Amino acid sequence: MKTKNEPKVILELAKESDLPEFQKKLQEAFAIAVIETFGDCEDGPIPSDNDVQESFNAPGAVVYHILQDGKNVGGAVVRINSQTNHNSLDLFYVSPEYHSQGIGLSAWKAIEAQYPDTVLWETVTPYFEKRNINFYVNKCGFHIVEFYNEHHSNPHMHRNGREDDKPLLNDDDFFRFVKIMKKKD
């Protein structure tokens, strides 16, 4: 439901030809917190090119542009499991110039509305992404249910694709969030 101050957004399916630009904008948005926390992105873009490609090509993946007034202001990659209705938000971003305008919440509500049979949504975010943690918990109603770290690894975490396959920027330190939408019958 759209409130008076909530911007209207539209989800538009991304075409295969859109994916390189989508990836670039996603990585630019993700770089902000990395640079604020670590000072740079010396080891390459976050998420890595390989991780983004894996998300684009995962079974059940759907890639959306987030549009406001006809402008591309962000994007999302969701994975939909129509058998279990346990769905995943793999990647989600709002371009930095559109932050703090309610676009993220409007987009998330549009995603929820697109998949009304969802029983559970799941996502992860790095431990240092305070903005994301606030968004998922305090705005969207997710709950933190797990903390992946060197002592408790994420069995589904994409590796960074480098030859040494070492974690990138504490790659293993992620919070896992879930949002239960409805109880199974």
Swiss-Prot record:
- Family matches, as SUPFAM superfamilies: Acyl-CoA N-acyltransferases (Nat) (SSF55729)
InterPro entries, from UniProt? Acyl_CoA_acyltransferase, GNAT_dom
Coiled coil, from the record? none
Stored Pfam families: Acetyltransf_1
Q: Which domain of life is it from?
A: Bacteria
One annotated GO molecular function is: acyltransferase activity, transferring groups other than amino-acyl groups
Instruction: Specify the N-acetyltransferase domain's residue ranges.
Output: 9-169
Q: What's the name of the protein?
A: Uncharacterized protein YrkN
UniProt source species: Bacillus subtilis (strain 168)
Q: Which gene encodes it?
A: yrkN
